[in-house]
């Protein structure tokens, strides 16, 4: 493969070959906030062009870019644009709109309105109408981050564990139920608001490493594990130099 897509998130690194206008088979692993295992970097593919999106710390981003520059003839780093591939961003200053959210919207663009919920370190929610106009969104802590924050302030509260219940009868279950339920409630409220605003049903797309536990609570949701990489593929196709 001559062109590859790289998505460097806050806690996970994903990459895939560019397969036409979509991402091919995805590989992924977790990384620390400021570092990535040397063996992982040495295992990166090589080719003609690397298309890179990063929301990770600057030091880690630069280390990954330096490694990619030894493996690819060209390394292209995506930045959020006011408009791309039929999507128009609502932010007055597009540079303040996260590149992961931007690419998720490119990946979600279709012929029907959509709400995109990304569940990672943060929970992000964005609404896109059928004409590609972004109507804004929300940012909150993801369930994982909520649990970690509670544990940091009250160490007796475990950072993991428990199962969802509408009314839990032990602490672990209550924590999972509260944090997962808060995320689901925000998504559902946003979906209802989007449908009222646009005057029609709105499709729900969910992505991110923290999304699977929420899917049983969101019966209309479609899970798109590679949504950001698919958006990066769209960006790569539409922004390629002539």
Swiss-Prot record:
One of its GO terms (biological process) is coenzyme A biosynthetic process. Pathway: Cofactor biosynthesis; coenzyme A biosynthesis; CoA from (R)-pantothenate: step 1/5. GO terms for cellular component: cytoplasm. It catalyses: (R)-pantothenate + ATP = (R)-4'-phosphopantothenate + ADP + H(+). InterPro entries: ATPase_NBD (IPR043129), Type_III_PanK (IPR004619). It comes from the Bacteria. The keyword Glycoprotein does not apply. GO terms for molecular function: ATP binding; pantothenate kinase activity. A monovalent cation. Ammonium or potassium. Its main location: cytoplasm. ATP binds at residues 7-14, 121. It is an enzyme of class 2 (transferase). Substrate binds at residues 91, 98-101, 171. Its EC number is 2.7.1.33. Coiled coil: none annotated. The active site is at residue 100. Belongs to the type III pantothenate kinase family. HAMAP family: Pantothen_kinase_3. Catalyzes the phosphorylation of pantothenate (Pan), the first step in CoA biosynthesis. This is Type III pantothenate kinase. The lineage of its organism: Bacteria, Pseudomonadati, Pseudomonadota, Gammaproteobacteria, Lysobacterales.
């Amino acid at each position: 493969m001559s062109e590859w897509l790289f998505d460097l998130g806050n806690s996970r690194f994903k990459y895939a070959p560019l397969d036409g206008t979509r991402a091919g088979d995805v590989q992924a692993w977790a990384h620390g906030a400021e570092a990535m295992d040397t063996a992982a970097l040495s295992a990166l593919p090589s080719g003609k062009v690397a298309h890179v999106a990063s929301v990770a710390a600057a030091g880690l981003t630069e280390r990954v870019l330096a490694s990619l520059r030894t493996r690819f003839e060209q390394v292209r780093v995506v930045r959020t644009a006011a408009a791309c591939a039929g999507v128009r961003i609502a932010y007055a200053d597009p540079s303040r709109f996260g590149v992961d959210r931007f690419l998720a919207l490119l990946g979600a663009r279709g012929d029907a309105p959509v709400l995109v919920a990304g569940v990672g370190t943060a929970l992000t929610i964005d609404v896109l109408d059928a004409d590609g106009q972004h109507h804004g969104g929300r940012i909150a802590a993801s369930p994982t981050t909520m649990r970690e924050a509670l544990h940091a302030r009250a160490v007796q509260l475990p950072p993991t564990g428990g199962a969802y219940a509408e009314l839990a009868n032990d602490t672990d279950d209550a924590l999972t139920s509260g944090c997962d339920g808060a995320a689901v409630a925000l998504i559902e409220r946003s979906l209802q608001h989007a449908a009222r605003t646009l005057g029609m049903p709105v499709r729900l797309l969910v992505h991110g490493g923290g999304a699977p536990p929420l899917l049983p609570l969101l019966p209309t949701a479609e899970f798109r594990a590679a949504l950001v990489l698919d958006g990066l593929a769209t960006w790569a196709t539409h922004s390629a130099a002539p």
